[in-house]
């Protein structure tokens, strides 16, 4: 049986934390900021953790990532 390979697009979008979680960056941050409030823009700058419902699926895609 062949080895499971890392999904390269996912590996570029997620980072593994020291405690084993997955960190992600938020969507809607590339353009059209004039329609967003300062508070929205400030919160979009922060990274967040992957939700538990998505964690198992994403973890299998980036299983070889350190």
Curated annotation (Swiss-Prot):
The keyword Ribonucleoprotein applies. Belongs to the bacterial ribosomal protein bL35 family. This is Large ribosomal subunit protein bL35. InterPro entries: Ribosomal_bL35 (IPR001706), Ribosomal_bL35-like (IPR021137), Ribosomal_bL35_CS (IPR018265), Ribosomal_bL35_sf (IPR037229). It comes from Streptococcus thermophilus (strain ATCC BAA-250 / LMG 18311). Keywords: Ribonucleoprotein, Ribosomal protein. The keyword Endoplasmic reticulum does not apply. It comes from the Bacteria. Gene3D superfamilies: 4.10.410.60. Residues 1-16 have a biased composition (Basic residues). One of its GO terms (cellular component) is cytosolic large ribosomal subunit. One of its GO terms (biological process) is translation. One of its GO terms (molecular function) is structural constituent of ribosome. Residues 1-20 are annotated as: Disordered. It holds the Pfam family Ribosomal_L35p. SUPFAM superfamilies: L35p-like (SSF143034).
């Amino acid at each position: 049986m062949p080895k499971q390979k890392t999904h390269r697009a996912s590996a570029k979008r997620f980072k593994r934390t020291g405690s084993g979680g997955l960190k992600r960056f938020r969507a809607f941050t590339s353009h059209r900021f004039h329609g967003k409030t300062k508070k929205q823009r400030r919160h979009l700058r922060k990274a967040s953790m992957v939700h538990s419902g998505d964690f198992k699926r994403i973890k299998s895609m980036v299983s070889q990532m350190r």
